[in-house]
Amino acid sequence: NIKFEDILEYHAKYFIPNNVYIVVIGDVNYKEVKSLISEKFGVWKKGKTINDPEPILTENVALTEINFVDLPTATQSAIQVTNNVNLKMNDEDYFAALMANDILGGGGEGYLFKNLREDKGYTYGAYSSLGSNRYGVSKFRAGAKVRNMVTDSAVSEIVKEISRIRLERVDSELLKNAKAKYVGSFIRNAENPQTIAGYALNIKLNNLEDDYYESYLENINSVTEADVKRAANKYFKIANTRIVVVGKGSDVV
């Protein structure tokens, strides 16, 4: 039902100079860049102040719910265990939350992958993700695509691993490796001008301190095993989670 006029209206409302940031990174002179931007964008007229309501965090379910979508042609079941989270980049436990998610399901070394892929052989990969934004309105997700016949077992194992990181302190070596992964990635990415531009934009969009990325590595390395456990309990739900499964009902239910 979207018409071309709707796109034009959207563009006119949101693509305005009082709703954008221009980030320039490189071997440049500030005065010259400012002059050039004024020359190229000076005729760009301001629009009306945007007063759209900020998104509001939806409450998680009172008790865990299972939502099943029957897809008769499916050869696999897609599983998502999810809950809403209130997490911002400037929250005190943000870096602990990053480490908790990485240890749970950030890659091949995560709890989920080692259990569902390496141990059980249910899937080619099992991962988790933890979102954040300036409004504190995002999601935690853990999931995998598995054979239809092992769907129930896979759900149980995913919940088991979420419970594990909530109840048990993570091994110090696992935390050390998770930190090293983030530190290495940060250093490599910092060599890319586009990444630096993204950092500058993040500081503005997320109301971060100007030295946020200068202390990034220090904040990562200061996370303790106890911090990880606290973050996992805060952001990874068990009793208030939604389990969504899309698969072939005749094989699963």
Show where each model-derived region lies.
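Non-catalytic beta-strand/loop surface segments
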Residues: N1-N18, V43-D91, D102-D152, L174, ...
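C-terminal regions of mature proteins
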Residues: Y21-G26, E173-V253
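Helix N-cap motif at beta-to-alpha junctions
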Residues: G26-K31, R147-T151, K248-S250
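Short amphipathic alpha-helices in soluble, non-transmembrane regions
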Residues: K34-F41, A154-E161, V253
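A common structural junction motif
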Residues: E39-K48, K160-R169
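Short beta-alpha connecting loops at secondary-structure transitions
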Residues: A142-G143, S163-L167, Y213-Y216
